[in-house]
Structures are given as structure tokens and as C-alpha cells.
């Protein structure tokens, strides 16, 4: 338990939760920057028995991560009890933004907060990382049902995506120290899954992304004329034609 004096009010910090700083910074790349959707201007932290989840979205992309519970900076043994059952917290982006990662930075930041009272007042938060402490209050709002966005069935049908969204996942991979190229699992005009965080990137952590496809507008649905450059027109291959061509290529290579 941590007691914090703040002006005329004394805050009793009942929970101290260790959050992987790199996972937190990576997930935060998906938050919105618009004031009108202030409830999305932060990372939603949820507490379960043996893990926590982190979620951020701006309505066009989503990044979600899971981290197994760790205890590296407890003031008292078992002081946090994992915070299972506590209401989720929207951790403000301006607190996360001030975390600066370096090669010698610690792995974890400590999120301290008090229990949610009956008065439903915003909880006072502290985010400690590498000898710095950020203080503030949780975002007072209900976070959207983000789990409904993540698809559980993928068609493989191709779609177009805003390049800026794809860049976000590349940045997230870099934050967690991965050199792997993010892969979009196309799902037609439905939300697509994105693999960007290899399982061995962060110990005890898993993460994925969701990208919303663009609705193609204009006259670019058809293949562009290329005969003037290549000497022949481009044609679409049917799945069967592509399969046969790939089979023959592999046979020739064997």
C-alpha cells in the first residue's frame, strides 16, 4: 500500500500493477488524437486473475496486448492482489507519452491507484518509470466494447488499407524490439487481423492488431492499363489459375 499526499487530499494507493513499458508504449500508438472522442485518448487497462490486458483504438485501427502478472516493485508482498475484479482504467495518453524508453530502461512501469469507490469519482493514478513519476486521474468514461471489433473468422479476401495505419503497426513492432514485418490477414471489407508482435518479443506478453479496410472510391477498382509499358495487358488470375501456376513453379524449383 502506498500513501500519497496531494495538496489537501490523501490518496491511499491500494494497487501497484507492473506493466511492461514497451508493450504499453506500443499499444498507445493506436489511441485517438481527437478531443471529440476523448474516451479513446488513452489505453484501457483491464485486470484479471493472472494477467492484465491493454487496449487502444481510434476507430480505424486497434492494438490489444496481454501481459501475465509480475511483481517487481511491490511495497508490501501481495499488496496489489492483481487488482482482479477492479473496474478497468483508461490510462491517459499524456501520462504514457512522458515515458521515455532507452536501451538501459527498466522493463516495467508501475501503475498505482486506489479502489473504485461507490461515489464513482475518477481514480487518482501514479505511473512510475525509471525514477520518474507521472500523476493524474483516469479518463472518466466508459470504454467501447472493443472485443466486438476483433474478427474471429478471416476470409482472405484482399482489401485496401490506409498506409498510415500500416505504418502504425510497423512502429509498434519497432517499440517492442521486433524486426519482423507486420502481416495483414485480409478479411474483405470486414476488419482485418494484423500480426505485428512475435510471441518471443516480450516475455509473458501477447499482442495483435486490427485494421479497418478502406472503401475503394473512384475508378481504380479495375486493373490499370500497362500494355504500353510491358507489351501486354494485365489480367486477373482466378484462384485455380494461381494455384496451378504456383504448383508448377514449385515443381520446377524442386
Regions found by a protein language model. Name each.
Residues 2-254:
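DNA polymerase processivity clamps
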Amino acid at each position: 500500500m502506498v500513501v500519497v499526499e496531494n495538496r489537501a487530499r490523501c490518496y491511499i494507493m491500494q494497487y501497484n500493477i507492473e506493466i511492461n513499458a514497451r508493450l504499453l508504449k506500443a499499444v498507445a500508438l493506436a489511441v485517438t488524437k481527437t478531443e471529440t472522442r476523448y474516451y479513446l485518448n488513452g489505453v484501457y487497462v483491464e485486470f484479471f486473475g493472472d494477467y492484465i490486458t491493454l487496449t487502444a483504438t481510434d476507430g480505424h485501427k486497434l492494438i490489444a496486448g496481454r501481459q501475465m502478472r509480475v511483481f517487481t516493485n511491490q511495497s508490501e508482498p501481495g499488496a496489489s492482489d492483481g487488482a482482479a475484479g477492479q473496474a478497468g482504467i483508461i490510462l491517459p495518453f499524456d501520462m504514457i507519452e512522458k515515458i521515455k524508453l532507452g536501451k538501459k530502461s527498466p522493463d516495467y512501469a508501475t501503475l498505482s491507484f486506489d479502489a473504485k469507490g461507490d461515489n464513482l469519482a475518477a481514480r487518482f493514478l501514479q505511473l512510475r518509470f525509471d525514477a520518474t513519476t507521472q500523476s493524474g486521474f483516469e479518463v472518466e468514461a466508459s470504454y467501447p466494447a472493443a472485443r466486438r471489433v476483433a474478427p474471429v473468422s478471416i476470409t482472405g479476401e484482399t482489401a485496401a488499407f490506409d498506409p498510415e495505419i500500416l505504418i502504425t503497426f510497423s512502429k509498434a513492432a519497432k517499440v517492442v524490439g521486433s524486426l519482423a514485418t507486420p502481416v495483414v490477414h485480409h478479411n474483405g471489407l470486414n476488419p482485418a487481423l494484423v500480426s505485428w508482435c512475435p510471441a518471443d518479443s516480450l516475455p509473458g506478453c501477447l499482442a495483435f492488431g486490427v485494421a479497418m479496410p478502406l472503401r475503394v472510391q473512384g475508378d481504380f477498382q479495375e486493373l490499370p492499363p500497362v500494355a504500353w509499358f510491358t507489351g501486354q495487358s494485365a489480367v486477373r488470375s482466378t484462384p485455380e489459375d494461381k494455384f496451378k501456376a504456383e504448383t508448377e513453379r514449385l515443381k520446377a524449383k524442386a
